[in-house]
Amino acid sequence: VSAIAALNSTLPRTQRFSSSDLVLSIDSLARSYPLLQVMNALFSNASVALNSVAGEKVDFALATMGVSPTVIIASSRTMSDYHDRIMQPHTGPISSLGRWVQSRTLEAGNMPSKNIFSQLARIGPTAELSLDKLRLICISHRIDGDASARLSSEQLTDLRVFTGARVVYALTGPGIAGAIAQTNVFDYRCLTGQSHFGSPLSSTEVTLTGMSESHVSDGIPEGQVR
């Protein structure tokens, strides 16, 4: 229960699930994060869509076919594969121009609005998708999962630009209800390398071990998550 409440409270009031949402999970409900996000949707009186195409690694276009959700719950592996196989190769000169303009808006701290540049950006990378109502993508990465599936800040920026949706990126782990940490939905920073996972959820207590006290200070918290 506390994990469901924590997932709900990490979203600002204007971005939380509501009765007007259609939530689609394309990640397996055998995993804690997608399951509790679906329960969060039900608690918020949102509609939930389920299909037979769900798992850690699925075809994003196939899994979203025939439905127009406002919220999608997916794994980092699914989104990483779709970005590398479809989005990046199909980003031509026109899409690149639209992406450049839209990414400048994100760097300024604002979510790009739907305009001519957003349409230009999506000409190639998301032409096969019908996600006009999509407003939020909830992505999770398992702490014991394949490191190659971790998303970079650049990939998260592409997902925001090409889908027109905000993105939250969560770190999950075995035995953890919901998530260990999750990014802020309004954090649009594009940093070098792999993206961070934000701050810990209110339902999680994180203990760092494996570092001697002489090497750890309040300014540099380091260690292994226990």
Can you say where each PLM-predicted feature lies in the sequence?
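Conserved AMP-binding/adenylation subdomain of ANL enzymes
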Residues: 2-22, 29-105, 166
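Eukaryote-biased feature marking scaffold/signaling PDZ-domain proteins and nuclear chromatin regulators
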Residues: 18, 27, 36, 201, ...
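Short, well-ordered beta-strand segments
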Residues: 22-24, 225
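Short hydrophobic segments within beta-strands
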Residues: 25-26, 140
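Short low-complexity stretches enriched in small and charged residues
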Residues: 26-29, 160-161
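Residues that cap or flank secondary-structure elements
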Residues: 28-30, 147-148
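Conserved AMP-binding/adenylate-forming
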Residues: 109-226
